[in-house]
């Protein structure tokens, strides 16, 4: 479309001016014109004060065409007219923490062409506003963040590698500035691990095959996360996927104490995956700390006597205590393992804790295990809602297995975790042909159904109320929520990173 000044003489009054536009008519598939604005007779326009109406409106038409051309250029620009503003809450937190100067000092070992704190902020804003790769951040996110500086793609790559090369420094900066505003509570700390998988076939020095939370068979990496008493992250660590997560509990707590100047006694809280004799030794003997762990109640973790005690009804020493909501519905019930003091001035007294013997290798290359005794309270709980959920899951697995076993030879790799409910037995037929026979492991199924809803907590805090121990332990759902938020909303799986520093920075 373009504008032009049309001059005509429709009457004896003289020259008549109109602004016309031409356009393409899709119906006739031809160019056409139409009146955009009627201006009037030249004589009337002169009488209104315009000395030369033809020249005057010719200039206006020229300006209209220039504006039209400028608008067209804006429409085909590769820059979006929309701007992200959802980062203002995060920006306010950055401003409150006031850590730009510290970040720039930490990054001063390298010469940057910009304030490194601006890059640090912008990368965080980008990952919160629209999670994705570094290329996506460069092309589609950072240019559209309101009031944020732009960076070249090479600058982003360099900064990401620099951050990942020593990411603990930035965690230390965060903790330092948080401590300036809020007093961090570290009398209890929560610890858990997760892992991330990568769409690659071959292992790298950092990405190794190991047990995956998503049952992925390829290389993975692990992340250990430590939270304070308010369930605010304190520290994190990344490690190859083939390594055990258990040593990282000790390492993170040691680093957290030294970096944050924590000298008092703390209570380590973790699930049964972190419960091992070496971690208990590190907490109680080496660090003079305490612990609250869950403990497996099936298999070889407990003696037959203790397993029978878990299922036992009330007797003279062991009584279940109900915990109910305000309308009287049972939330859970609990009991503690009772012991009789055999000697001393309190001989014959019944207490809800006992001395338990543990043994472990202090160093991996030690020839002998070290034995040590811990004064420990053991609390068993029963949750009816959890019991119903677990029984439904077991029955669903069993029904699925029955269908599989009825029409094919089951292979452990096909069944996955459900293999625990299947007996695999090699049978020799006439000494020539070996066939693998499969059958349901009814004993295992019955045992799991029997213990559904039960859980055991073990703690060094023998004077603590069992309900308080239960409450503290179940705050672990916060760390699980942290991982869930990271993996879902923030897409924290570093699918677009390959080397260790980039993965850590992501």
Short names for language-model regions:
Residues 1-118:
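Conserved glycine(s) in the ABC-transporter nucleotide-binding domain "signature"
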Residues 2-6, 10-11, 15-17, 21, ...:
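Anion-binding and metal-coordination hotspots
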């Amino acid at each position: 479309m373009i504008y032009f000044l049309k001059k005509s003489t429709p009457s004896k009054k003289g020259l008549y001016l109109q602004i016309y536009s031409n356009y393409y008519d899709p119906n006739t598939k031809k160019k056409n014109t139409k009146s955009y604005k009627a201006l009037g007779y030249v004589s009337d326009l002169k009488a209104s004060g315009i000395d030369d109406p033809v020249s005057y409106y010719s200039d206006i038409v020229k300006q209209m065409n220039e504006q039209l051309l400028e608008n067209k250029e804006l429409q085909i620009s590769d820059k979006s007219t929309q701007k992200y503003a959802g980062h203002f809450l995060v920006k306010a937190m950055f401003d409150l923490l006031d850590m730009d100067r510290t970040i720039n000092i930490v990054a001063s070992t390298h010469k940057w062409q910009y304030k490194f704190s601006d890059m640090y902020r912008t990368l965080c804003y980008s990952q919160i506003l629209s999670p994705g790769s570094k290329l996506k951040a460069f092309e589609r996110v950072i240019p559209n963040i309101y009031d944020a500086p732009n960076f070249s793609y090479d600058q982003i790559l360099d900064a990401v590698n620099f951050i990942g090369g020593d990411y603990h420094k930035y965690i230390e900066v965060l903790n330092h500035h948080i401590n300036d505003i809020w007093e961090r509570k570290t009398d209890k700390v929560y610890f858990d691990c997760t892992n991330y998988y990568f769409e690659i076939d071959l292992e790298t020095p950092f990405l190794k095959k190991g047990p995956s939370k998503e049952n992925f068979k390829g290389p993975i990496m692990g992340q250990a996360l430590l939270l304070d008493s308010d369930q605010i992250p304190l520290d994190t660590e990344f490690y190859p996927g083939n390594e055990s997560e258990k040593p990282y509990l000790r390492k993170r707590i040691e680093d957290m104490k030294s970096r944050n100047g924590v000298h008092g006694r703390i209570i380590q809280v973790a699930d049964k995956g972190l419960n091992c004799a070496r971690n208990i030794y590190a907490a109680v003997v080496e660090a003079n700390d305490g612990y609250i762990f869950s403990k497996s109640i099936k298999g070889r973790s407990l003696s037959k006597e203790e397993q029978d005690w878990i299922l036992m009804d009330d007797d003279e020493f062991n009584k279940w205590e109900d915990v109910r909501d305000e309308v009287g519905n049972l939330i859970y019930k609990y009991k503690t393992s009772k012991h009789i003091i055999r000697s001393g001035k309190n001989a014959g007294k019944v207490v809800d804790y006992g001395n338990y013997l543990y043994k472990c290798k202090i160093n991996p290359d030690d020839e002998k295990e070290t034995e040590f005794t811990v004064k420990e309270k053991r609390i068993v709980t029963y949750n009816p809602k959890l019991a119903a959920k677990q029984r439904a899951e077991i029955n669903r697995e069993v029904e699925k297995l029955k269908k599989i076993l009825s029409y094919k030879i089951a292979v452990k790799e096909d069944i996955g975790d459900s293999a625990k409910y299947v007996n695999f037995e090699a049978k020799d037929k006439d000494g020539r042909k070996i066939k693998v026979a499969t059958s349901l492991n009814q004993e295992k199924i019955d045992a799991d159904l029997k213990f559904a809803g039960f859980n055991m907590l073990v703690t060094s805090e023998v004077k603590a109320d069992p309900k308080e121990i239960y409450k503290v332990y179940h705050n672990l759902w916060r760390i699980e929520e942290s991982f869930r938020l990271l993996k879902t909303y923030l897409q924290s799986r570093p699918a677009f990173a390959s080397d260790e520093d980039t993965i850590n920075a992501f």
